[in-house]
C-alpha cells in the first residue's frame, strides 16, 4: 500500500492539571507549564485555581481587621456558668441605683418623644457609610500585610473586583447624598439626634466588650457560606449602624475616619468604667433599634449594593447577640409605660352597644311577626290523602297450608296430653300423701326412688317420652299387645331403626361383591333366650396336716426330709407359711371330725358360727395351695395329685 493512504494516528490529548496543595519538583513543574493552556488575556480578571481556605470566624476578624487569626483558640477550661439566683439577688440589692440612673438618662435624652421609625434618607446614608468603610478597611488590610500569602493575594483580588463593581453605585449614592444634605440638615430634629447618640453608644460598647473578653474565651460566630469570598476580607465593624451625621462625615473626610473612631472609642470606654449600669440599661433598646434598621436595609435591594447591606446586617447582629446572651438573666425595666388611646377605647365600647341594640330590635320584630302569624288560621291548599287499606296476604300453597294444619293439630295434642299427665300426677301425689301416714318405715324407703322422678338414672333407664319402640313393647302389658292388630305389628316390625342410615356412595355404579354379599343383622325383639352356667364350684380334698397328726414324730421327720430334697428352694424361702399350719392343728382336727357339706353350711350359717370358721380355714388352705402351684413346688398338677393320693394310702 502506498504511504499516502495510511491514516495518521493523532496524538493522545493531554489532561489538564491543576496546581496541587503540595509544591512539585522543578522538572515536574516545567512539564506541567509546557502542557498547560496559554495564559488568558490581561483584560479579564484572574480566576483563582483553588478555593481559599476560610479564616477563623471570631469576633476579632469581624470587628478588628488588624488582629486576624488563622485558627480560633480553644479555652483550656470550660467557663463556669453563674446561677440565676445570684444575679437576681444582686439585681434586687442594686435596684435603687439603677432606677436613679435610668431616671437621669430619661431626663437627659427625653426618650418619651423618641420615634422608633427612621427616615428613608437616613437608611440610604447608612448604606453609603457602610460601603465607604468597607473600602477603607480593605485598603488598611492591604497596607498592614507585609508578606502576603498566595491565598491573601486571591482574596485581595476578589475584594478589588467587588470595589470596581460597586464603584458606580457609590457615585450615584454620593450624588444623592450631596443633593439631600441641605434638606436633611434642616429636617433633623431632636428625635434623630437622640437616635444617633444611642447608635454610637451601642457600637462603641460592642467593641469594648470584645476587648474585655479574654483570648481563651472568645465566642465563635457562624456566618453563612453563601457570602462572596471577596467580601469576607472587607467586613465592617460592629458599629456600622451609626447616625446620619457621622455617615455624612465619613463620606466627606475618608482619611480622618479611623482617627475619629479611635478617639470616640476611648471616650466611650472611660464612660463605661465610670458608670457601667448606664450602658447595660440602654443596650436592650439599642439592640431592638439595630434589628429594625437591619430589616429595613435588607428589604430595599439596590443592584450591586445588596451584598454589602447583607454583610452590614450580619456584622451588626453579632455584638447584639453577645450582649443579649450576657443580659438574658437580668430583667429589663421599660423606660415608660404605654399610653392608652382613649378615643379608640371609647369607639370600641360604643360599637358593641350599637350592635346589641340592632340585634335586640330585629329579635323583637321577629317575635311580633311570629305571634301575629300564629293567631291567623291557615287554610291548607290540598286535602290530606286517605290511608290505603292494608295489603291482602296471599293465599299459601296447598302444601304449606297442609303443613300448618298438621303443626296446629300436633300442638293441640301435646297440650292435651300434658294437661292430662299433670292432672294424673297431681292426683297420685295427693293419694300418696294420704297413705304415707299409714305406711311403715320399710315402705318409705321403697318409695324414696319414686320421689326422685328420675333424677338419678339407673342402668337402662330412659326418659319415658323418648323410649325406643322395642323397649315400649317389652314394658307394655300383653293386653295392649292383643289390642293391636296384625297390620300395626307388621308396620312396627318393618319400621326403620333410628341408628341405621344409608351409606352414601357413588350413584349409578354397582357395589363390590364383598360389600353386596354382606348380610344385614335383624334384631328379633320378641324372642328371649335363656342361658344357664355355673358361677362357682367347691372341691374338697384331704389336707396334709391331718396326715401329719396321725403319724409318729419319726415318720414326720423322714417325710420332711424327703420334701426338702424335692423342694429345697421353696421350703427355705417359705418357712413362715408352715407356721400357721402347725398352730391350727387342733382346730382343724375338730373341724375334720365334724365336716359338713357346703350346702348345709350355707343353710346353717346364721344358726352356728362353726360354719363361718370352717369357710375361712378352707379359703386359707386354698390360697396356700395356689401359692405352691404358682411358685413351682410341683412340676404338674398331676404330680401334686399323686403326692396327695400317696399320702392318703399310707394312712
Swiss-Prot record:
Region of interest (Disordered), residue spans: 1-85, 110-522, 549-651
InterPro entries recorded: Aim21 (IPR021582)
GO CC terms in record: actin cortical patch
Residues annotated with Phosphoserine modification: 36, 70, 104, 183, 206, 231, 284, 324, 592, 595, 597, 599, 639, 643, 647, 650
One Pfam family of this chain: Aim21
Modified-residue entries (Phosphothreonine), positions: 18, 58, 85, 277, 552
Compositional bias ranges of the Basic residues kind: 110-119, 501-512
Subcellular location: Cytoplasm, Cytoskeleton, Actin patch
Interaction with SH3 domain of ABP1 as annotated region, ranges: 383-396
Stretches with biased composition (Polar residues): 133-149, 164-178, 296-323, 414-427, 437-452, 575-586, 594-605
Keywords: Cytoplasm, Cytoskeleton, Phosphoprotein
Transmembrane feature ranges: none
Biased composition (Basic and acidic residues): 9-19, 179-213, 243-272, 339-361, 372-383, 471-482, 556-567, 639-651
Subunit structure: Interacts with ribosomes. Interacts with ABP1.
Recorded family membership: Belongs to the AIM21 family.
Function of the molecule: Involved in mitochondrial migration along actin filaments.
Protein name: Altered inheritance of mitochondria protein 21
Higher taxonomy: Eukaryota, Fungi, Dikarya, Ascomycota, Saccharomycotina
